[in-house]
Amino acid sequence: AEYNKHKNDKGYVNEAISKDLVFDSSIVTKDTKIDKITGGKFIKASDFNKVNQGQSKDIFTKLSKDMNGKATGNFQGSKVSAVEFGPKGGYAVLLEKNKPVNVTYTGLNASYLNRKITKAEFIYELQSAPSQSGTLNAVFSNDPIITAFVGTKNANGKDVNVRLTIKLYDANGKEVLPEKDHAFAYALSSLNSSLGTNYSVEHAEFVSDFG
């Protein structure tokens, strides 16, 4: 009914797409977690949470600093908490240009054409960042639907550009790939922008180059 109401609206597809891939909030179980993170440098929780006197302690302030490539934490020592990261928190990691970071989730209850998906890999590769050091701070949530928050200190106005590759696996460890007539359908949310005269800093978030 909702599709029929909007099918002629701009931004909607002309024909309804079946939901063959189930990967939404319903797939999160009590066992869902980040099993491991490889390829990146862990930021100590104490370093991530550090703010200057008088600064806000919100996550966006904590993300908006340049670590200058210095991150000497470990997996467990990088765990941070905030309501935005979900009830199980997340892990603070430093991304460096052209160095992929692999975040592996286990304990999933997802599916594709009734084939159970229990594991997912989210591979992030930084392409550019506006910090002086060229690095980007990230917090990867233990909830794969919340996914990640990123930020750094803006020194030169460059775009934040991150390439994301997602791989899904069944209970036997075999990668799940889309079939020709049953494409994966993506719904993207929390893409924010601040454009116009009411904002001191203009920015827009978008996704491009699917494939």
Question: What are the residue ranges of the model-derived segments?
Answer:
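Structured beta-strand/turn binding interfaces of compact recognition modules in eukaryotic regulators
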Residues: S189
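N-terminal/edge-of-domain interface segments
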Residues: N4-L177, N192-G211
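Loop/turn elements at helix/coil->beta-strand transitions in domains of secreted/extracellular proteins
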Residues: H182-A183
